[in-house]
Amino acid sequence: MQKQQTLKDKFCLQGKGLHTGLDIHITFCPAPEESGYKIKRVDLEGQPVIDAIADNVHSTRRGTVLKKGEVSVSTIEHAMAALYALGVDNCLIEVDAPEFPILDGSAEPYVSEIKRVGLVEQETPRDYYIIKKRMEVSDPESNSKLILLPDDEFTVDVHIAFPSKVLSNQFASLETLSDFEEQIAGARTFVFVREVQMLLEANLIKGGDLDNALVIYDEPLAQDRLDALSDMMGVERKQVNELGYINNKPLIYDNEPARHKLLDVLGDLALIGKYIRGRIIATCPGHSINNKMARLIRKEIKQNEAQAPVYNPNKEPIMDINRIKELLPHRYPFLLVDKIIEVGPDYIVGVKSVSGNEPFFPGHFPGEPVMPGVLQVEAMAQVGGLLVLNTLTEPSSYSTYFLMIDKVKFRRKVVPGDTLVFKLRMISEIRRGVANMRGLAFVGEQLACEAEFMAQIIQNKE
């Protein structure tokens, strides 16, 4: 199972702010596991910290703005996309201004530095949220829509459309995060010339220029008007004779604007706080609709904090009943696990089909058969025993004895016809032959039972 990661070392970048025009210093630092992304405003008294999560997004006009109390920080999306795509789970970001520097308008400078310092694996497993149902958010006014579908991986498709002679319809896609560096990271932010005056009058894009954004000239303007806009931006005047892109650097990709919109989608969804497995289809996305989806996913995560494993009954098991009997001493009527469907270095998923013929149902209870809670815990413990034995080179030589069962909770009745799916995960590394695990038992998507276990591993067989 993939572990959480943080930076091996800190790195620093310097550049001007897109909207403030300030000279900004930003430092990315390693952070403890389970801390996520945190942003520290080192220029303010007390150096307040803002959690980079979707719930803290205050504004989405021309960028994503986080706010906590009176403290805010903006233009974070390019950095967030780079951290997320390159597999950084935990990072403390120190910045001395109310926004991140725009740099070259893409995520490439962040990617380059992350690659340079490298990553270090941490102890805690990365917790993915698996999308199991269609989710959709939309905005009829802007024709924006984000659809999230179940998928084994994380993929993104983006379609953008503008009423423009230069930029009308474009598509971009990302089939795996490992392609981000090559296919998406270098795509720069963009703006239409016709929007520039309005943005300047709104006290925005003070740091914008022809090096850190694609400037799209799609409606003819008199040269004196173009000169006036150049003067307002503080950039060199430029003679423009035809519609198109007016930049100091050529397009990196033919569909660079669409790729940048995909970059923004990643950056805004990084604020979910977890990696997800699902397919995103984004139509005319923007920071507002991206944040709407991120908030919806966070709400789903909170409502389903303990998420059931994916169970496909047609899939060949990792361990069938015969292999289980080779490892566990239990036999009928006390062998309470039918198969193992998934196993990793520190977790396991097992299945128990609860039949109406179980020997305990006639007495528990007549007329209302309910699986005893203690037997649910026993079944979970047997799956946990298989997890422990799976870590050993010669598992058939060992037995597992449970020393303690703690924090047991029963959430719903288990009745004939139910299928119990157990997921157990190591809480810590096995030390001196003692293993600590947390177990969850599900019926469908519902949590039925949970408990924590301590077990002793003993070599007692030839």
From Swiss-Prot:
Record EC number: 3.5.1.108, 4.2.1.59
SUPFAM superfamilies the UniProt entry points to: Ribosomal protein S5 domain 2-like (SSF54211), Thioesterase/thiol ester dehydrase-isomerase (SSF54637)
Key word Transmembrane helix present: no
Binding site for Zn(2+): H78, H260, D264
Gene Ontology CC terms, in alphabetical order: cytoplasm; membrane
Subcellular location: Cytoplasm
Pfam families: FabA, LpxC
Record flagged with keyword DNA-binding: no
Catalysed conversion reaction: a UDP-3-O-[(3R)-3-hydroxyacyl]-N-acetyl-alpha-D-glucosamine + H2O = a UDP-3-O-[(3R)-3-hydroxyacyl]-alpha-D-glucosamine + acetate; a (3R)-hydroxyacyl-[ACP] = a (2E)-enoyl-[ACP] + H2O
Domain of life from the UniProt record: Bacteria
Record pathway: Glycolipid biosynthesis; lipid IV(A) biosynthesis; lipid IV(A) from (3R)-3-hydroxytetradecanoyl-[acyl-carrier-protein] and UDP-N-acetyl-alpha-D-glucosamine: step 2/6
GO terms classed as biological process: fatty acid biosynthetic process; lipid A biosynthetic process
One Gene Ontology MF term: (3R)-hydroxyacyl-[acyl-carrier-protein] dehydratase activity
PANTHER family: UDP-3-O-ACYL-N-ACETYLGLUCOSAMINE DEACETYLASE 1, MITOCHONDRIAL-RELATED
Protein name from the UniProt record: Bifunctional enzyme LpxC/FabZ
Organism of derivation: Porphyromonas gingivalis (strain ATCC BAA-308 / W83)
